[in-house]
């Protein structure tokens, strides 16, 4: 098992803008305001897809931006809410906020969903602001900005394919050739003492996880050598790739190796022999390999399909990967015969705005900079092209206590105040 990790950017859709409009119909004097509200922006929703096994797809698309809501219209018509953006993830994906490290979701079962970036609400149209003293307001809100964040996806990956075979037959070399994994490679027994895993992608954009498992020797089912550790990992795989050294340089007979490994898999008695097995004749670039392969074929018979390859020269590797990918698609998952802790450790996470309404700092040129979730959200939802909206924004700032706080920090008439990229003069 290893942890695959990728960083992506998600943004919920902005809400649609409210509209300033008036009812203008014949025989209807003083029709009044008729601007509709904007629609809600779409959420970015992660959903578990049981057919996915890796995070490979996120290597190519790392930005996910949901659609904004439709703007409000005249005649009191509200904008349409946008459809949520569904992002498929494999089972076992943990989503963390990159900035805070907070776990946003732990996605386990097929169809499970989690809202990772909420869409903004639609801005209100001018019909919402009508009062007895202002029956025809020329004011409307912009849509609320959608939530945006960088998130880290982590996936504890189990291997789809297990490489088995005696030590030093070339399993680590094969894994390094077909994936980005970089296992230790050396010509001595038990080079691999813990499983190395790599994500393999075929030429037709299919992907799977391949494990170079610890070398297996006779007696592994009884715990000899690294036996139990090896067999626990292979128990989780769906396809077994049996790598055999056809060069004979180690002084072993390829057929005897083949029989010994299969006997060990059978003795472990966890349906390992029911898994499809691909026999790989490796090191075919060596001098005596072809002769040894012919002798091996005579002993195993025609019913065993053999893929001659050279992991070093990559000869035959492409056809091997296509065969393995086809077998994975047609082979069901096998049950795991071990105790699994099923205690309920689920946690509900709730999106909350920041507790502090605003913060005031002063730059070297004397400019007062106001920041904070509430004031920045209010600023973005204000339509500054309309005088009435600007006056409303000034009232909202006073209501938040910003004017009073600026005076306490020494602000005087004519001083520059900045919110985001917008600058204005302070008037006492």
Swiss-Prot record:
Residue ranges occupied by any Obg domain in the UniProt entry: 1-158
EC number: 3.6.5.-
Localisation per UniProt entry: Cytoplasm
OCT domain: residues covered: 350-428
Domain OBG-type G: 159-329
Residue numbers binding Mg(2+): 172, 192
UniProt-listed InterPro entries: G_OBG, GTP-bd, GTP-bd_Obg/CgtA, GTP-bd_prot_GTP1/OBG_C_sf, GTP1-OBG_CS, GTP1_OBG_dom, GTP1_OBG_dom_sf, OBG_GTPase
UniProt-annotated binding residues for GTP: 165-172, 190-194, 212-215, 282-285, 310-312
GO cellular component, one term: cytoplasm
Signal peptide boundaries: none
GO molecular function, one term: GTPase activity
One matching Pfam family: MMR_HSR1
Entry keyword annotation includes Nucleotidyltransferase: no
Keyword Magnesium set for record: yes
Keyword entries, A-Z: Cytoplasm, GTP-binding, Hydrolase, Magnesium, Metal-binding, Nucleotide-binding
Cofactor(s), by name: Mg(2+)
GO biological process: ribosome biogenesis
Family according to the record: Belongs to the TRAFAC class OBG-HflX-like GTPase superfamily. OBG GTPase family.
Subunit (UniProt): Monomer.
Functional note: An essential GTPase which binds GTP, GDP and possibly (p)ppGpp with moderate affinity, with high nucleotide exchange rates and a fairly low GTP hydrolysis rate. Plays a role in control of the cell cycle, stress response, ribosome biogenesis and in those bacteria that undergo differentiation, in morphogenesis control.
Protein name: GTPase Obg
Species whose genome carries this gene: Bacillus cereus (strain AH820)
Gene name as annotated: obg
């Amino acid at each position: 098992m290893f942890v695959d990790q990728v960083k992506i950017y998600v943004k919920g859709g902005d809400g649609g803008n409210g509209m300033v409009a008036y009812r203008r119909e014949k025989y209807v004097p003083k029709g009044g305001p008729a601007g509709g509200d904007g629609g809600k922006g779409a959420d970015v929703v992660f959903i578990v897809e049981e057919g996915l096994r890796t995070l490979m797809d996120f290597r190519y698309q790392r930005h996910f931006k949901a659609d904004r809501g439709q703007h409000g219209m005249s005649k009191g018509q509200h904008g349409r809410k946008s459809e949520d953006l569904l992002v498929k993830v494999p089972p076992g994906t943990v989503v963390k906020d990159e900035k805070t490290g907070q776990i946003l979701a732990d996605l386990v079962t097929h169809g499970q969903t989690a809202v990772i970036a909420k869409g903004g609400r639609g801005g209100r149209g001018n019909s919402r602001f009508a009062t007895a003293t202002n029956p025809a307001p020329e004011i409307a809100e912009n849509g609320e900005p959608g939530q945006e964040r960088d998130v880290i996806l982590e996936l504890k990956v189990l291997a789809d394919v297990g490489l088995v075979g005696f030590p030093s037959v070339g399993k680590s070399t094969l894994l390094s050739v077909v994936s980005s994994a970089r296992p230790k490679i050396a010509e001595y027994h038990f080079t691999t003492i813990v499983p190395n895993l790599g994500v393999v992608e075929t030429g037709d954009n299919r992907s799977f996880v391949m494990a170079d498992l610890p070398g297996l020797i006779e007696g592994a089912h009884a715990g000899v050598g690294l036996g139990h550790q090896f067999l626990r990992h292979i128990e989780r795989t769906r396809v077994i790739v049996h790598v055999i050294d056809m060069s004979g340089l180690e002084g072993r007979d390829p057929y005897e190796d083949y029989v010994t490994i299969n006997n060990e898999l059978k003795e472990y008695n966890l349906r390992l022999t029911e898994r499809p097995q691909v026999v790989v004749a490796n090191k075919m670039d060596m001098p005596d390999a072809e002769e040894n392969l012919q002798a091996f074929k005579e002993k195993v018979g025609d019913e065993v399909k053999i893929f001659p390859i050279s992991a070093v020269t990559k000869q035959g590797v492409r056809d091997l990967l296509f065969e393995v990918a086809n077998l994975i698609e047609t082979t069901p998952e096998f049950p795991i015969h071990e105790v699994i802790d099923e205690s309920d450790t689920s946690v509900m996470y709730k999106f909350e705005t920041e507790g502090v309404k605003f913060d005031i700092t002063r730059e070297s040129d004397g400019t007062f900079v106001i920041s904070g979730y509430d004031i920045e959200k209010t600023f973005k939802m204000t339509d500054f092209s309309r005088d009435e909206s600007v006056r409303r924004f000034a009232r909202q700032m006073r209501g938040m206590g910003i004017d009073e706080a600026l005076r306490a920090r020494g602000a005087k008439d004519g001083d520059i105040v900045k919110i985001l990229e917008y600058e204005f003069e302070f008037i006492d």
